[in-house]
């Protein structure tokens, strides 16, 4: 079975995270997800994330700590999804590949119809965040 490596960005600003709505003509249309995409053979996960966020959102991202990985089978392929925290970026967000973008708290994000693969990543991020010492 083919394995596909995918990276996802949990972009955080002022305590809120960014969700992106999948386009109407896509697989899992209308569901909300973390921006990201496939890792090319010649790049690291961090490099892939910076490239994907530039392509999808028009931003230059600062990739922070690794959050979690999740694996699931989709259409006869194994998708290995890796989430990274993005605590900072430069540029103005633009939805190049998504229907809509929304900022919300991680708790509010659970109320959105999320892409199933992103739910365990959000939960892992919330657990990490809860364990962080207060500034």
Curated annotation (Swiss-Prot):
Cofactor-binding details, from the entry: Divalent metal ions. Mg(2+) or Mn(2+).
Keyword terms of this UniProt record: Hydrolase, Magnesium, Manganese
Effect upon mutating residue 56 to A/D/Q: Abolishes enzyme activity
Co-factor(s): Mg(2+); Mn(2+)
Domain of life: Bacteria
Record GO terms (molecular function): 8-oxo-7,8-dihydrodeoxyguanosine triphosphate pyrophosphatase activity; 8-oxo-7,8-dihydroguanosine triphosphate pyrophosphatase activity; 8-oxo-dGDP phosphatase activity; 8-oxo-GDP phosphatase activity; dCTP diphosphatase activity; hydrolase activity
Catalytic function, reaction form: CTP + H2O = CMP + diphosphate + H(+); dCTP + H2O = dCMP + diphosphate + H(+)
GO biological process: DNA repair
CDD domains: NUDIX_MutT_NudA_like
EC annotation from Swiss-Prot or TrEMBL: 3.6.1.65
Renumbered ranges of motif Nudix box: 37-58
Disulfide linkage: none
Domain Nudix hydrolase as annotated: residue spans: 2-127
Protein's job: Hydrolase with a preference for pyrimidine substrates. Has high activity with 5-methyl-dCTP, and much lower activity with CTP, dCTP, 5-hydroxy-dCTP, 2-hydroxy-dATP and 8-hydroxy-dGTP.
Family the UniProt entry places it in: Belongs to the Nudix hydrolase family.
Assembly information from the UniProt record: Monomer.
Protein name: CTP pyrophosphohydrolase
Source organism of this protein record: Escherichia coli (strain K12)
């Amino acid at each position: 079975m083919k394995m596909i490596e995918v990276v996802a960005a949990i972009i955080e600003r002022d305590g809120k995270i960014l969700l992106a709505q999948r386009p109407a003509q896509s697989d899992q249309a209308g569901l909300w997800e973390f921006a990201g995409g496939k890792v090319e053979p010649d790049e690291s996960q961090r490099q892939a994330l910076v490239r994907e966020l530039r392509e999808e959102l028009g931003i230059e991202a600062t990739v922070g700590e690794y959050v979690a990985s999740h694996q699931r089978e989709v259409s006869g392929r194994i998708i290995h999804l890796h989430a990274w925290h993005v605590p900072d970026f430069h540029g103005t967000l633009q939805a190049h590949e998504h229907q809509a973008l929304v900022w919300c708290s991680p708790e509010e994000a659970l109320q959105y119809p999320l892409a199933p693969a992103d739910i365990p990543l959000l939960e892992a991020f919330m657990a990490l965040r809860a364990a962080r010492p207060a500034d």
